[in-house]
Amino acid sequence: MSVRELVVLGTASQVPTRHRNHNGYLLRWDGEGILFDPGEGTQRQMLRAGVAAHDLHRICVTHFHGDHSLGLAGVIQRINLDRVPHEITAHYPGSGQRFFERLRYATAYRETVALTEAPVAADGVIADTPAYVLETRRLSHPVESFGYRLVEPDGRRMLPERLAAHGIKGPDVGRIQREGAIGGVSLEDVSEVRHGQRFAFVMDTRLCEGVHALAEGCDMLVIESTFLDGDHQLAEDHGHLTAGQAGRVAKDAGVRHLVLTHFSQRYSDPDAFEREARAGGFEGELTVAHDLLRVPVPKRH
């Protein structure tokens, strides 16, 4: 059975708190797991959330500030300790290669797993698989930062009433899907486009073109909202977003489910982030993330 969900491992910005771990997010996409921004303590949070090293297939790092990458050392060593049977690919800003290598080889351990380093240098497609295309866009932060966007290819949805009208049933349904036509009836005659799902992960950044490009038409957008709108100048100065800005981005992009995260420790009321995102005009499904939360990707239209 296919599962598409976000497992939230940590939601703090800069420093962990009593209730929030450093960042960490696992996207389960059918049989694959993509780990985003493993901050300090991610390995333990995986244990608490029921996420095994075997669940990981890709690691995507947006930038090399500690709250988004210090957990790499422990996660990589755990992958090797558990002898994960498949290859792991790591994506990260190429300008931070030295940081990745320091974290990968922070201490002595036995390497048992093939880990492919795939540094990112520019906007564009970084992985093209039968199940999805993974893209990056440059963001605006004091250090080089990239956001990630996963796009599922469009498919086709068979329409029972049209199949019946053309007398197509049983094994012929599978045949027309494979071959594209049967006896003058085309696949387009008995089906419609089923748009693939889209997911985006946007961390530390000011508002910029990359934010909007990543968010466009997403079924789920996971986005930082470090500050509330009253501290918008702090957000701008330090390369971050406010909850209101995140809400406006999601509204303009037609996002279906907005997930807010990466909260400054200066705020004690999580509901304030939802209020400000709503005030920004977003009317879709909205989640203020907390540690160990599971958020299903919205079902296809």
From Swiss-Prot:
Keywords: Endonuclease, Hydrolase, Metal-binding, Nuclease, tRNA processing, Zinc. It catalyses: Endonucleolytic cleavage of RNA, removing extra 3' nucleotides from tRNA precursor, generating 3' termini of tRNAs. A 3'-hydroxy group is left at the tRNA terminus and a 5'-phosphoryl group is left at the trailer molecule. Zinc phosphodiesterase, which displays some tRNA 3'-processing endonuclease activity. Probably involved in tRNA maturation, by removing a 3'-trailer from precursor tRNA. SUPFAM superfamilies: Metallo-hydrolase/oxidoreductase (SSF56281). Its EC number is 3.1.26.11. The active site is at 67 (proton acceptor). Zn(2+) 2 binds at residues 67-68, 204, 262. Its cofactor is Zn(2+). One of its GO terms (molecular function) is zinc ion binding. Belongs to the RNase Z family. Zn(2+) 1 binds at residues 63, 65, 141, 204. NCBIfam families: PRK00055.2-3 (NF000805). It comes from the Bacteria. PANTHER family: ZINC PHOSPHODIESTERASE ELAC PROTEIN 1 (PTHR46018:SF2). Binds 2 Zn(2+) ions. This is Ribonuclease Z. Homodimer. The keyword Transcription regulation does not apply.
